[in-house]
A protein has these predicted regions:
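Catalytic-domain carbohydrate-binding cleft regions of carbohydrate-active enzymes
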Residues: 1-264, 269
Length: 271
């Protein structure tokens, strides 16, 4: 069942979608059935987009909207995760919103980031905060989802595309996505270099699998803020532009057109 407004008609928060009432078991099973059709055709992962808000004037079967608002993402992702695991054997979704408990239903990505240096820096900060909140796996749109002011016709600068690809290589999951073409052949000047970084990514797959297993066992994220390894170092509590990728790689992305790291207080004595 779709949720309904106070007059009993189907309530849609968006022009192109209804919002499913996951507090109602029949609605949840109906949704799982739709996903099962896709999974039976060979789909291996469902993107649970949106889910970060609900409308307070809608009626839900099992909960008041003011209590459901944050919980909705958890119920939404749980349903998709469960049916995916039942059909494919692999427990995975590609989720945007999250609340406490959603770490049980990986993975999540950072949403619609701006294709700029600031957007890249903000994505990394968000990912590190996400890891500190208990989420082991996290991704982001490479090389950002949109530009400004041309939101829907975003052409990314080559240097941003290249540096964001490098950031993506050292992330738990990598995906190219945006409001315009993101395939590397649309960026011919840098496509050969992108290919080299992809080869490195595939070389790292055994390491990523090993670190992922450790993350599942321990709860530690793959992208680890420096304080994971250096909690006694006060400076590390303020560094949000580099991270450990698993236990063995210290990653410091370049996030400017000058192709350099710029921190006068760069701290490497104990790293």
């Amino acid at each position: 069942d779709l949720k309904q407004d106070s007059e009993g008609s189907n309530f849609s928060a968006l022009d192109y979608a209804g919002t499913i009432d996951f507090t109602y078991p029949k609605a949840t099973e109906w949704y799982k059935g739709l996903l099962k059709n896709l999974l039976d055709m060979g789909v291996t992962c469902i993107k649970t987009d949106f889910g970060e808000n609900i409308h307070m004037d809608a009626l839900y079967k099992g909960m008041k909207p003011e209590l459901l608002n944050n919980l909705y993402a958890l119920l939404y992702q749980k349903a998709a995760y469960e049916i995916t695991k039942d059909v494919t054997g692999d427990g995975i979704v590609w989720a945007r919103s999250a609340w406490a408990g959603c770490q049980r239903y990986p993975l999540h990505w950072g949403g619609d980031s701006c294709s700029s240096w600031d957007g890249m820096a903000g994505s990394l900060k968000g990912g590190l905060h996400f890891g500190l909140s208990g989420f082991a796996f996290w991704s982001h749109d490479v090389p950002g989802f949109h530009t400004l002011p041309n939101f829907m016709n975003s052409i990314v600068d080559d240097d941003v595309y290249m540096r964001w690809t490098q950031f993506g290589v050292f992330s738990s999951h990598i995906r190219y996505h945006g409001t315009n073409k993101r395939e590397p052949w649309h960026y011919p000047a840098i496509a050969p270099m992108i290919k080299k970084w992809w080869k490195l990514r595939y070389t790292l797959i055994p390491y990523i699998v090993e670190q992922s297993r450790k993350a599942i066992a321990s709860g530690a994220p793959l992208l680890q803020a420096l304080i994971f390894h250096h909690p006694e170092d006060k400076l590390c509590w303020h560094i949000d532009d580099e991270y450990y990728f698993g236990n063995d790689f210290l990653v410091a992305p370049v996030m400017n057109s000058e192709n350099r790291r710029d921190r006068s207080e760069e701290h490497t004595s104990e790293l």
